[in-house]
Amino acid sequence: LILLAGFIFHTIFLCVQYAALGTAPVLDLKSAFSFFSWCIVLVFLVFHLKFRIMVLGSFVAPFAAFLMIISSAIPWAAGPVKPIFKSIWLTFHVTTIFLGNGLFAITFVAAIMYLIQERQIKQKHFGSFYSRLPSLATLDSINHYALIWGFPFLTLGMITGSIYAQVALGSYWQWDPKEVWSLVTWLFYAALLHERLTVGWRGRRAAVMSIVCFCILLFTFVGATLWVKGYHDFSSIGTSGA
């Protein structure tokens, strides 16, 4: 209930931000972390309706809260929003990309839970924590469903991002560091999806690969933005990309 209440207030806050900015509220790093957190909680709530696994929230909530703590520690970016950022293509781009990220965060959490549960079973530690975690089959199913839905969102986000780049910059592809790392991320998740659907990857192997893929995604989200300069740089809301 606390997580749901927080999600509702967060949703209202994001709607107010969208109305004030006239575009998706992710033009600075502070807002990006906030929106990422919101997407993760949204995806968890949807998955909770299907799987009815409350303990999943015990892993998701700290991660989402950590993102909000980072967001709150970053000062607001100053400056007006350039008209070029008030594009419906930009809104489509960031919304689909972040929803994909939220779904992949669920694959990451499910993978961590899978490895914890698997270790408890192998070591025959059947305590209270073991009984609270779902079965290995259920955790693998959560991982699978999140991947199945996350990959199309990531793909759609990259397509709409290319369209926005053409509208804003005159080219579908700029070889921006974040574009390159987004492609790397896409290729890794494509490989994971291929192995799951055609080779039949399940269990530990899929869990480990999900963790690897999400680490690459996090580097794309933060590292490729902060450490390598490009037009996706979050340096200022009035002068940077999204």
Tell me what each language-model feature is:
Residues 123-137:
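Cytosolic, membrane-interface loops and tails of multi-pass inner-membrane proteins
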Residues 81-89:
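Active-site-proximal inter-transmembrane loops
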Residues 1-80, 92-121, 136-168, 174-241:
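Hydrophobic cores of alpha-helical transmembrane segments in multi-pass integral membrane proteins
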